[in-house]
Swiss-Prot record:
Gene3D superfamilies: 3.40.50.20, ATP-grasp fold, A domain, ATP-grasp fold, B domain, Phosphoribosylglycinamide synthetase, C-terminal domain. Pfam families: GARS_A, GARS_C, GARS_N. This is Phosphoribosylamine--glycine ligase. It comes from Streptococcus pyogenes serotype M3 (strain ATCC BAA-595 / MGAS315). The gene is purD. Mg(2+) binds at residues 284, 286.
Amino acid sequence: MKLLVVGSGGREHAIAKKLLASKGVDQVFVAPGNDGMTLDGLDLVNIVVSEHSRLIAFAKENEISWAFIGPDDALAAGIVDDFNTAGLRAFGPTKAAAELEWSKDFAKEIMVKYNVPTAAYGTFSDFEKAKAYIEEQGAPIVVKADGLALGKGVVVAETVEQAVEAAQEMLLDNKFGDSGARVVIEEFLDGEEFSLFAFVNGDKFYIMPTAQDHKRAFDGDKGPNTGGMGAYAPVPHLPQSVVDTAVEMIVRPVLEGMVAEGRPYLGVLYVGLILTADGPKVIEFNSRFGDPETQIILPRLTSDFAQNIDDIMMGIEPYITWQKDGVTLGVVVASEGYPFDYEKGVPLPEKTDGDIITYYAGVKFSENSELLLSNGGRVYMLVTTEDSVKAGQDKIYTQLAQQDPTGLFYRNDIGSKAIRE
C-alpha cells in the first residue's frame, strides 16, 4: 500500500513516520514535506498543498490508496471534496464539516444549538458594535478572528483598551484579511486548558489520550501566542471523570449534530477545552490533528496506524490500542524572533542519539545537502516517552543543553504544570 500525506510540518512528519511503520505500507509520500523527513525514509513530492489538481494527478499516477490531510487551510479549501470527486479517498473532513474550525461563529452556533458548554459570546462585522459590546462586557475578554489565522488570531485582552485595539486591527486594519472580517468576542474562561482528540467517522468516534499544549512563546506562559512550543500526553492530573464528561457533553452531541446538519465528519477532531469551576467547556475546535500534540500522541499508539485509519474510513470497527503507562513529552525548538520576524539558514545541531525522536518542521538541506538549516518559525521537536513528566523533562533538556542550538530558542518549562499539580 502506498499513501500520501499532505502538509510540511512536524505534525505531518509524525503522521507519515507512523504510517510508514505500519505493516501493509510500502511507501509514504509527503507533499510538499520538508527535507528532514527524508532522514526517516519518507519520499517528498514537490507539490504545495493548494495545488489540488496536481496532488490528485500524482495520487492517480502513483496508485495511492488514500491521502491523509494535515493542514487546516487545505481542508478549508475543500481538498477532501476534490479528492472524493476525483474518485480518491482522503482522511479528513469535507469543507462543510471543516467549518467547525474555519468559522468560529459557525462552531459557536453548533454549540448553542446542541447545548454544548462554551463561553458566552457575540459575533460582529461592524467595529462600532464590537466596541460597544466590549465596553459593556468589560475585561478580561477574548477577541478572535472568525476565520483561519495560523493560530495567531486570538487575543486574550486584559483591558478594555486592548480588546478594542484587537477588534480594530481585525475589522478595520485588515490584519488577517478576510479571516478577520468578522470577530467572535467571548467571555474569558478561567481554568486549566487541555486537548482532546478523536478519530471520527460520522457519529462513530475513538478518543485518543489527553494532551496539554503550551501556546505562549516563553517560560511561565509569557509572551505572544504561537502555534505551540511543546506538549505532553496524557495529562496525569486530569481525572478520567472530566474526560468522560467532555466526551458525553461535548464530543458526542457535536458529532451527532454535524450528522443532523448534513455535514457528517470524517477525520481527526481536535477539541480545545478548559476545565472551569462549572466543568469542561469548549475553547475551540480544530478539524485536524494539532501541532505539536500529534508528535506526542502518535508515539503512544501501539496498534497499526494505517490499518486503523483504513478501517475507520471503511466504517469497520478499528482495533486501536494505546500505551498505558508513562508520559510522552516533547519540546519545540524555534527560530529566534518567532512568532514574528526571524532569520533562516541557521545550521541545526546533529541528530539526537538513542530513543529521543526528532520531528522536523521548518528545515531544508544546505546546497551541498550535508547540513540541515532552519527554514521556518518552528524548526524541530524532540520527543521522548518516560515514566514521568519529570523524567521526560530531564531527558529532553539534557539533550538540548548538549545541542546548544545557536540562533534558536525553546521553552524550559514544558510539562511543569503537571509537576506542580
